[in-house]
């Protein structure tokens, strides 16, 4: 589109493509809600009083607002391809996402990020990413890839890469680790936003983190923590995900004068939640808590647009992209317009687009065979370290226990809820199998396994017996990754053949399969609401207290490996 034509359309000299007539505009610039007839030409807003248009939509008694922006999301948590993700969230008014693809990057590296970007071409939403800053997350496990300064610099040259992803290595920042600072410097040199991740950081350490050019954080769980970060110049992203839900606490920080520095994000939202809520739900909740509606919408639109340098995005105003939602007075989304075209109405996607199915390299590079011997634990001591898990928590504890021993081998002890757990390396065919014991899953028989295992996403399996563990791992390998519940044979599965993280199926099918696998784990004895969510975090060696990787047990507080036997 020529700018001359948009100017002519704004003056009424050219007929507009579309006119939204009779609505009330939520104006994120003036802070008002005022009557406006919105004219659209060539995918952009032309003006507020165009005399005619090829198509007119009456939006009398409705609110008009910019399309929502999810300021930080790991799309891999949805287990959906970008096209299917769009089908789920576009009808709810989310038209731009800032995705941090560090999950697929840990498996496939730069190729994984490029794959997602190619698959997102042509979908009715703006799919942008940040360059993952911490791949791998630690040196305590085997990942599928590593992103150094050169890879990050190359990624940041892509216009779709709008920043450096969350800098989880805050110790490396404040202690001036050279490779860490090099990543920050290259992002700053390219004028890209630098995203943060600093749960619980305060005082001088927080000031040091902010001084390193960190610009935002989505990890705050307490209002006091968020206010301290705001005072240090760090913008706050209020998060409402599946596991981490911080909205009710963080609405306490919202003041009339600080709202330009607050944004909204989902971070990690699984498919069972994504079909029911997204940024639209957060906006309604914030308004219900007493926040001015215009301020609530600013947090989901113009604020993240400015934060990430998205020019001509995040507002309904002349010269801005026509990414628009039409809402009723309860702030429910009724119509969605992306780049000037209506793409959804009354909760249903109306746009037609191709769901790309591109070839992707295998991510199951396991040294075979996997046998009962792979999970054998010789009884070489009297007291063992057991990973203790609790319902709806990702923190673990270290439990000292006397193991059940048979014929000189440690076996699972279902009476005391102590089961075998193993992490099988799947990226480089190293043959690494980390072995341990875990309490809290409650399985009485069989095994469950997953290739979703933060952050390196090796295969993790928990089982009552070695034979079931073998079958579970073999089942995952054969289907290219996913979730399985096994009782003699595989009784339920959720295939995730794309990097062992993503499904090619529709969101409804993914939800059904996920629920079936979780139900199957309950039939094996688990009382956890979501045993696979708990399983996926057992191998994350950056969250206290005791974890397991393909290289063995990790004491997170000591940031090092520890033996299974304490004595």
UniProtKB/Swiss-Prot annotation:
Keyword Repressor among record annotations: no
GO molecular function, one term: adenine deaminase activity
Pfam families: Adenine_deam_C, Amidohydro_1
Keywords recorded for this protein, A-Z: Hydrolase, Manganese
Lineage: superkingdom: Archaea
Entry-linked Gene3D superfamilies: Metal-dependent hydrolases, Urease, subunit C, domain 1
Signal peptide start-end: none
Disulphide-bonded residues: none
Catalytic function, reaction form: adenine + H2O + H(+) = hypoxanthine + NH4(+)
Record GO biological process: adenine catabolic process
Enzyme Commission identifier(s): 3.5.4.2
Reported cofactor(s): Mn(2+)
Similarity field: Belongs to the metallo-dependent hydrolases superfamily. Adenine deaminase family.
Protein name in the entry: Adenine deaminase
Phylogenetic placement of the source organism: Archaea, Methanobacteriati, Methanobacteriota, Stenosarchaea group, Methanomicrobia
């Amino acid at each position: 589109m020529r700018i001359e034509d948009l100017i002519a359309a704004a003056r009424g000299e050219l007929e507009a493509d579309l006119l939204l007539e009779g609505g009330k505009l939520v104006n994120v610039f003036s802070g008002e809600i005022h009557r406006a007839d919105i004219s659209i030409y060539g995918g952009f807003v032309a003006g507020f009083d165009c005399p005619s248009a090829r198509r007119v939509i009456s939006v009398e008694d409705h609110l008009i607002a910019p399309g929502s922006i999810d300021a930080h999301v790991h799309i891999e948590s949805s287990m959906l391809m970008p096209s299917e993700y769009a089908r789920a969230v576009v009808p709810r008014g989310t038209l731009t996402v800032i995705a941090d693809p560090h999950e697929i990057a840990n498996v496939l590296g730069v190729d994984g990020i490029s794959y997602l970007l190619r698959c997102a071409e042509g979908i009715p939403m703006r799919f942008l990413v940040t360059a993952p800053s911490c791949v791998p997350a630690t040196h305590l496990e085997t990942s599928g890839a590593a992103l150094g300064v050169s890879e990050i610099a190359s990624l940041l040259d892509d216009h779709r890469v709008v920043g450096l992803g969350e800098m989880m290595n805050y110790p490396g920042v404040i202690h001036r680790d050279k490779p860490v600072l090099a990543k920050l410097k290259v992002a700053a040199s390219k004028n890209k936003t630098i995203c943060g991740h600093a749960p619980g950081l305060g005082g001088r350490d927080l000031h040091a983190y902010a001084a390193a050019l960190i610009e935002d954080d989505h990890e705050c769980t307490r209002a006091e923590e968020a206010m301290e970060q705001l005072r240090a110049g760090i913008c706050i992203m209020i998060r409402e995900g599946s596991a981490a839900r911080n909205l009710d606490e963080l609405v306490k920080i919202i003041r009339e004068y600080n709202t330009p520095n607050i944004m909204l994000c989902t971070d990690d939202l699984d498919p069972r939640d994504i079909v029911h809520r997204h940024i639209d739900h957060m906006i309604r909740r914030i308004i219900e808590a007493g926040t001015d509606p215009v301020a609530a919408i600013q947090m989901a639109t113009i604020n993240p647009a400015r934060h990430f340098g998205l020019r001509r995005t995040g507002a309904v105003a002349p010269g801005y992209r026509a990414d628009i939602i039409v809402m009723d007075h309860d702030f429910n989304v009724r119509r969605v317009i992306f780049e000037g075209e209506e793409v959804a109405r009354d909760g249903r996607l109306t746009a037609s687009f191709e769901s790309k199915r591109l070839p992707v390299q295998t991510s199951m590079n396991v040294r075979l065979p996997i046998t009962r011997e792979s999970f054998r634990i010789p009884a070489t001591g009297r007291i063992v370290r057991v990973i203790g898990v609790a319902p709806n928590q990702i923190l673990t504890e270290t439990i000292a226990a006397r193991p059940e021993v048979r014929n000189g081998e440690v076996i699972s002890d279902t009476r005391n809820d102590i089961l075998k757990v193993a992490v099988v390396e799947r990226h480089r065919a190293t043959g690494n199998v980390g072995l341990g014991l875990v309490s809290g899953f409650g399985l009485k028989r069989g095994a469950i396994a997953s290739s979703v295992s933060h952050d390196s996403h090796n295969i993790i399996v928990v089982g009552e017996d070695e034979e079931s563990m073998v079958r579970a791992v073999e089942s995952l390998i054969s289907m290219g990754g996913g979730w399985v519940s096994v009782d003699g044979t595989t009784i339920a599965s959720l295939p995730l053949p794309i990097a062992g993280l993503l499904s090619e199926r529709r969101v409804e099918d993914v939800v059904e399969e996920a629920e079936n696998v979780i139900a199957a784990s309950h039939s094996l004895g688990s009382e956890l609401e979501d045993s696979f969510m708990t399983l996926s975090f057992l191998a994350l060696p950056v969250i206290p207290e005791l974890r397991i990787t393909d290289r063995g047990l990790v004491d997170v507080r000591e940031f090092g490996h520890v033996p299974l036997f304490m004595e």
